[in-house]
Amino acid sequence: MGVEIQSPQEQSSYTVEQLVALNPFNPEILPDLENYVNVTSQTYSLEVNLCLLRLYQFEPERMNTHIVARILVKALMAMPTPDFSLCLFLIPERVQMEEQFKSLIVLSHYLETGRFQQFWDEAAKNRHILEAVPGFEQAIQAYASHLLSLSYQKVPRSVLAEAVNMDGASLDKFIEQQVTNSGWIVEKEGGSIVLPQNEFNHPELKKNTGENVPLEHIARIFPILG
């Protein structure tokens, strides 16, 4: 038995997430989903965005490329999740060939490969697309910091500056915030930043499963080997 389609009056009493759960293939919810993507606050739901892109597949004449671009920008902000690739899979190839989408795909590649200097250079050429979404720069700076913390035990100030696209007083303030909130340490000599230890930048912290095999399991192996 199919899900009953609510009237517009009934739909207005639901949240966007509930509408997606109840009527994911109902084109009548398209305006609600588009409004959700367009809001200026930093709202984000992968499920809502994927639902909207699927509905565009069924109703191609109603596709709003401005909305699609906004979805992809928000997906970039969700790095290191695979959201960008998941959304891109639902966008027709003919749409992907438009300049704004080609630029977003290039930006995604730079982020995934940690090529931050190239990313910020390309981003500067596409500010009209990226700055339409609040918090974009801050989200990418957080991702860059996360990626550095997985790769390095210590980074020179110059490397951090390139990754987060900051310098001078703004970089000083950013580092101070990370010292307070994320446990960064600034060396007195040289000013390099010591990043918190984790199992990626300090492999010795990663638990060796072989060391945790219960003794009784080992005892059972010896008769078999004999």
Swiss-Prot record:
The record's principal subcellular location, in a coarse class, is cytoplasm
Residues in PCI domain copies = 44-202
What stretch or stretches form a coiled coil here? none
Keywords from the named record: Cytoplasm, Initiation factor, Protein biosynthesis
The UniProt entry, under SUPFAM superfamilies, shows: ARM repeat (SSF48371), Winged helix' DNA-binding domain (SSF46785)
A single GO cellular-component term on record: eukaryotic 48S preinitiation complex
Q: Which GO terms describe its molecular function?
A: ribosome binding; RNA binding; translation initiation factor activity
Q: Which Pfam families match?
A: CSN8_PSD8_EIF3K
Task: Please give the superkingdom of this protein's source.
Answer: Eukaryota
Q: Which GO terms describe its biological process?
A: formation of cytoplasmic translation initiation complex; regulation of translational initiation
- Where would you find this protein in the cell? Cytoplasm
Known role = Component of the eukaryotic translation initiation factor 3 (eIF-3) complex, which is involved in protein synthesis of a specialized repertoire of mRNAs and, together with other initiation factors, stimulates binding of mRNA and methionyl-tRNAi to the 40S ribosome. The eIF-3 complex specifically targets and initiates translation of a subset of mRNAs involved in cell proliferation.
Q: Which family does it belong to?
A: Belongs to the eIF-3 subunit K family.
Q: Subunit details for this protein? A: Component of the eukaryotic translation initiation factor 3 (eIF-3) complex.
Name of the molecule in the record: Eukaryotic translation initiation factor 3 subunit K
